Amino acid sequence: MLLQKTLGLKEDAYLVEGSFEGLEMNLRTLDYLDKLSMLPAGSIDSALTIVDKGGSAIGAAFKNKLDGGDFWFVIPYPAAKASRQQAEKLVNAVLGGGIVSSVRKKKVDPGQFRKALREYLAVSLAEQALCECDKGREPKSFAFNEGRNERLRVLMQRLAKENGFNLKEMSALEICCGNGMSTAAIKPLFKDILCIDNDRCAICNGVYHGTLDPESAMVVDAMALTRFVGEKYDAVLGLMLGTIYEFNKNIWRMIFEEAVKTLKDDGFLLFTVNTKEEMDFLAAALEEMGIRGAVIDNRNKNDIYDGWAFFAVRSNGRFSH
């Protein structure tokens, strides 16, 4: 696992929390640290303070003794300032209280550390270690559609060529990725791609069938995207969004607003939907946000996927097509 490799550990490593939301809320972590603080001196053999290249603390890890084999609990600090300060204060109290016999620093690349966290949570989910779901696995055919894949690749490559983009040099963010059917088509085109969806079962199936790479998949709510994704991307994609109904239009507006915040200048948006009615709403909602783009009739008689596309380029803070 990347988590062990990144931290240079020989023993197994586990997260105290079981989701990205859990990593931000930090409730299990605070309980764990509270229990550690009550241990007598020298109870913990060793610990790590995890720091970035500049020396700032981004997490900690504690070694746990067990007859069947020692293991580590890893604690990444939350992004929110108050939560991070609370966790760091409790960690420092444990480290400075004589409870840990040996403490050393481990310098890591923050991007690699985040990738390791994603892989850990995605693999654990696919192995059904993080839920008690009794649903059967979706068949592999649910995650693959070569006809759709080819049409998506053609559309993406055509738009890139017409607008002077080199996809192989671009990092992409795909929102609402589902089980990764569309991801399988486009990930070979980009330098790298991060995929998010709030459906645990969809991410689980995508990782299990290989349409989603575990180190590049996250179960997070797109309405709170910037809470969990701090980076900006060269391309932001939402492929076969929906279904968009009257009652959930406000939710989609929030998703669009969050998605746009993660796009770099000189990057592009590409959203696809099934119906003209959905596209009319999408284009109008984005125009209300000051985003004007091209609406593309991409219908195909063979299936319902990606019938309408919206494409916009961001340049000097403004959108055009």
Predicted feature locations:
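Conserved beta-strand signature within the Rossmann-like core of class I S-adenosyl-L-methionine
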Residues: 266-274
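Conserved SAM-binding loop of SAM-dependent methyltransferases across substrates and taxa
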Residues: 179-190
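Conserved SAM-binding strand-loop segment of SAM-dependent methyltransferases
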Residues: 212-224
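N-terminal accessory regions of S-adenosyl-L-methionine
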Residues: 1-148
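Conserved class I S-adenosyl-L-methionine
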Residues: 167-178
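A short acidic, Gly/Pro-enriched loop at the edge of an enzyme's catalytic core
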Residues: 227-237
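Conserved alpha-helix/loop element of class I SAM-dependent methyltransferases that forms part
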Residues: 143-168
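A short glycine-rich, Lys/Arg-flanked "PGG" loop and its adjoining helix->strand segment in the class I
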Residues: 251-265
